[in-house]
């Protein structure tokens, strides 16, 4: 199961969905342009 938009995440263990990335600053999944 992956994390979607605006879900809180850990930058060291990025479990965001495909095309998303865990923001180190905000600590939630953002769309990776």
Curated annotation (Swiss-Prot):
Cross-referenced InterPro entries: Huwentoxin-1, Huwentoxin_CS1
Leucine amide modification, residue list: 33
Pfam family, one: Toxin_12
GO biological process: envenomation resulting in negative regulation of voltage-gated sodium channel activity in another organism
Compartment(s): Secreted
Annotated keywords: Amidation, Calcium channel impairing toxin, Disulfide bond, Ion channel impairing toxin, Knottin, Neurotoxin, Pharmaceutical, Secreted, Toxin, Voltage-gated calcium channel impairing toxin, Voltage-gated sodium channel impairing toxin
GO molecular function: calcium channel regulator activity; sodium channel inhibitor activity; toxin activity
SUPFAM superfamilies, alphabetized: omega toxin-like (SSF57059)
Effect of residue 5 to I: Important increase in potency toward Nav1.7/SCN9A, and low potency on Nav1.4/SCN4A and Nav1.5/SCN5A; synthetic variant D1Z/M5I/K18Y/R24Ka and synthetic variant D1Z/M5I/R27Na
Tissue spec. comment: Expressed by the venom gland.
Keyword Disulfide bond: yes
Residue spans crossing the bilayer: none
Any one GO cellular component localisation term in the record: extracellular space
Cystines in this chain: 2-17, 9-22, 16-29
Family: Belongs to the neurotoxin 10 (Hwtx-1) family. 04 (CcoTx1) subfamily.
Domain notes from UniProt: The presence of a 'disulfide through disulfide knot' structurally defines this protein as a knottin.
Function of the molecule: Inhibits many voltage-gated sodium channels and one voltage-gated calcium channel (Cav2.2/CACNA1B (IC(50)=400 nM), Nav1.2/SCN2A (IC(50)=3-70 nM), Nav1.1/SCN1A (IC(50)=523-1060 nM), Nav1.7/SCN9A (IC(50)=129.1-5120 nM), Nav1.4/SCN4A (IC(50)=263-888 nM or >10 uM) and Nav1.5/SCN5A (IC(50)=188-323 nM or >10 uM)). It acts by shifting the voltage dependence of channel activation to more depolarized potentials and by blocking the inward component of the sodium current. It shows moderate affinity for lipid bilayers.
Further remarks about this protein from its record: Synthetic variant D1Z/M5I/K18Y/R24Ka has a N-terminal pyroglutamate and a C-terminal amidation. It shows an IC(50)=2.7 nM on Nav1.7/SCN9A and IC(50)>3 uM on Nav1.4/SCN4A and Nav1.5/SCN5A.
Protein's name according to its UniProt entry: Beta-theraphotoxin-Cm1a
Organism: Ceratogyrus marshalli
């Amino acid at each position: 199961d992956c994390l979607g938009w605006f879900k809180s995440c850990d930058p060291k263990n990025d479990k965001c969905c495909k095309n998303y990335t865990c923001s180190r600053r905000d600590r939630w999944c953002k769309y990776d342009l």
